[in-house]
């Protein structure tokens, strides 16, 4: 059953409202500053965005969050989104042209060469997972992401240098004020 799509534009054209399945953020993501060298750092026991950010003294928006899904045929989908955002599964499904996606299990994640809790797009075999990057990641500089090794993360991940050829799309859930 499809959800009704609602879009409301203000008469002055300066604002709009839309349901979350289609809402587009007004935030602009532009890389700033010099791309620093990719650096592997020890992050013992830090698996969540809050744990990693706290341990390294960075804000969640300076991290990348890996989320894994599988499609109806069991194909793996690796999603990377900025750590302060959530994946909008409706947008992801629409982009992929899928009716259904489910969270992948740890075995599926490991088969692609990733480590649950420490997953990274760096080193993922693209033949084993479709990689989808949110525009928030593509437009950010020097993010902290997993290193595909327990208790380690990379600092200074930059899309375009450390990963290329992923689908870059808007798959973030729009928050109030975005």
Model-derived regions, located:
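Extended, low-hydrophobicity, polar/charged segments
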Residues: 2-178
């Amino acid at each position: 059953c499809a959800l009704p799509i609602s879009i409301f534009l203000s008469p002055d054209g300066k604002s709009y409202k839309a349901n979350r399945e289609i809402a587009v953020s007004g935030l602009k993501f532009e890389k700033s500053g010099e791309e620093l060298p990719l650096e592997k750092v020890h992050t013992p026991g830090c698996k969540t965005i809050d744990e990693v950010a706290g341990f390294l003294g960075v804000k969640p928006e300076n991290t990348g969050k890996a989320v894994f899904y599988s499609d109806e045929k069991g194909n793996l989908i690796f999603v990377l989104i900025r750590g302060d955002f959530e994946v909008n599964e409706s947008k992801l499904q629409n982009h992929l042209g899928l009716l259904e996606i489910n969270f992948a299990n740890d075995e599926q994640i490991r088969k692609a060469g990733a480590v649950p809790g420490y997953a990274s797009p760096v080193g993922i075999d693209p033949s084993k997972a479709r990689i989808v990057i949110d525009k928030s990641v593509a437009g950010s500089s020097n993010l902290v992401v997993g290193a595909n090794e327990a208790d380690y993360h990379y600092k200074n991940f930059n899309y375009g240098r450390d990963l290329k050829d992923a689908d870059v799309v808007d798959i973030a859930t729009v928050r109030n004020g975005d």
